[in-house]
Amino acid sequence: MGANNSRLFVLLLSVAAAVGIGNIWIYPYYSFSHTGLFFIPYLIALIVLGIPLLMLELSMGQYFNKNVVDLFASIRKWFSGIGWLMVFNSFILMSFYAVVLAWHIIYIFVSFGLQWKNDASKYFFTNVVQASGGFNEFANFSLPVFIALILAWLIIFFYIRKGFAAIKKAFLITFPIFVFLMLMFFVYSLSLENALQGVYAFLKPGLRGLFKGEIWLASFALALTSLGLSFGIMHTLGSKSGKGFLVGGDFICAGEKLN
């Protein structure tokens, strides 16, 4: 792969690593629940904290050209604990996404009959996760989720077992599918009844909301999580970018545009 293609590929991988629930679900939730002007404190949080930390992580990975544990150990031996904490963060996050992936696997098999068409929420809690009534009934066990979760971890294992090379190949398949599905959801949502009213409610400005402390806390928290920081992801991508790769310009544009 040529230098220009490698540069583009690392850039796309960084975007793919950052795009997630923080961008698709949490940002619209905050914007709707607080104010349509939520993007103002969010952009400030990105400029003040998010983008500088993104550049720092990418630059560290590019300079040391090591995995995140060895990278911090190169600074100080006992700093390796920071790297291990980032690995642990990634494992916790991946454990969450593995469960979500398990739900998707279940719905792939049951989608042909549209068994949830009458009451989607009831079907999910009763048939899929088989939720209990409380902690007193904690002994309930969902066999479909358990089997799907094992399958999800097997998919993750085969996805990453050969390292970065395997991830690149899988990315070339999964990322276009993701973009296509997002476009489909966007077009479908605009075709729903009262879609424009929903867009207005989502973007409705409220100046008073900007003076609430909680909206600023949410903005800075979202700026950190939505860019995929503190998980060792950007350190790794930086180490794959090569010494001649310019960290600043491209990744600032990527960080701002994907949000």
Regions found by a protein language model. Give the residues of each.
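Membrane-interface "cap" regions at the ends of multi-pass membrane proteins
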Residues: 1-25, 51-58, 62, 66-74, ...
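Hydrophobic alpha-helical transmembrane segments of multi-pass small-molecule transporters/permeases
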Residues: 10-17, 42-47, 83-94, 153, ...
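Central hydrophobic cores of alpha-helical transmembrane segments in multi-pass inner-membrane proteins
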Residues: 22, 46-58, 62, 68-69, ...
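Inter-helical loop and helix-membrane interface segments of multi-pass membrane transporters/permeases
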Residues: 30-33, 68-81, 85, 100-164, ...
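Hydrophobic core segments of alpha-helical transmembrane domains in multi-pass membrane transport
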Residues: 45-49, 89-95, 101-112, 147-160, ...
